[in-house]
């Protein structure tokens, strides 16, 4: 060994610079390590004939380019295990949730029925998810999106509100698989329904008084007597939920609803093709009387006492002051003159 290294040093001192000199400096115990780190020697490192690099400048250039000092690795080979829950957060476990790394992609790719969970979806440990408390039984479809591979029980839920929660049961591998498959089908059905609803457009109010509409339909089809509407409304009140329209329990409102339900069957019994039955219930087209207010009546009486007949200009002025039309003022003065004439006849009979 010593003789070989001495021979190599002698060859290098004679001017032949090759990989023998580097080999003697490094040693034989780390050939495999350095070969893996630096790779095989390039074409420039092959042995060159003597006399090519005899000058001191070439020797200095060779030594400057070959700096094989062993360096310490930037990252150590063994990483220290990160604690699942820091000591500061251990005291306040109700406020801070530990970070849970996502599952590896290889595990999700091995199962074709699942997909990679996004960061917005809850982890299976959360009760709202299908693989947690909500889908632990494995029978009912979960409300949340389908989880990925099984994760820890105390995962983040990202503030998603838990929906209908089933009874908690020990989740096994078979139940998790079945619940994930059922949640996949339910989520796909919900997606199809939402897409169909969006394509149809706004077909009506989403939150309507279904119970009230059902009662009206039942009264319209089967109600023949005056109390059919009330029977339909009160008969189902004990078993079903109360109507969403009757949010205000005021006695006046209930009486009005009963009166409406009384009048509805009578109107529905009328035959639209029978004019003999409809003329009794016909509405008059005559305009209703619009009485004047006390202030308007007082001002008109003052004007009548001052002058029984008004000119057109004065009539327009009075109508503008009292917020009336010119026609109303003219008709009132006509009626007032007829009333005065009638009163004068009563006071002075013909015999006198």
Curated annotation (Swiss-Prot):
- Please cite one Gene Ontology biological process associated with this protein: negative regulation of transcription by RNA polymerase II
Residues in the DNA-binding region are: 285-344
- A Pfam family annotated for this UniProt entry: Hox9_act
Tell me which GO cellular component terms the UniProt record holds. chromatin; nucleolus; nucleoplasm; nucleus
Q: Which UniProt keywords apply?
A: Developmental protein, DNA-binding, Homeobox, Nucleus, Phosphoprotein, Transcription, Transcription regulation
The main location class comes to: nucleus
Q: Where is the composition biased (Low complexity)?
A: 166-188
Q: Does the keyword DNA-binding apply?
A: yes
Compartment annotation = Nucleus
Q: Which residues carry this modification: Phosphoserine?
A: 146
- Give the matching InterPro entries: Abd-B_homeobox_TF, HD, HD_metazoa, Homeobox_CS, Homeodomain-like_sf, Hox9_activation_N
- Residue ranges under compositional bias (Gly residues)? 126-143, 229-238
Membrane-spanning segments: none
Q: Which GO terms describe its molecular function?
A: DNA-binding transcription factor activity; DNA-binding transcription factor activity, RNA polymerase II-specific; DNA-binding transcription repressor activity, RNA polymerase II-specific; RNA polymerase II cis-regulatory region sequence-specific DNA binding; RNA polymerase II transcription regulatory region sequence-specific DNA binding; sequence-specific double-stranded DNA binding
Q: Which domain of life is it from?
A: Eukaryota
Polar residues: compositionally biased ranges: 197-208
Region: Disordered; residue ranges are: 126-208, 229-276
**What is this protein for, i.e. what is its function?**
Sequence-specific transcription factor which is part of a developmental regulatory system that provides cells with specific positional identities on the anterior-posterior axis.
Q: Which family does it belong to?
A: Belongs to the Abd-B homeobox family.
Name this polypeptide is given: Homeobox protein Hox-D9
> What is the protein's species of origin?
Homo sapiens
Classification lineage? Eukaryota, Metazoa, Chordata, Craniata, Vertebrata
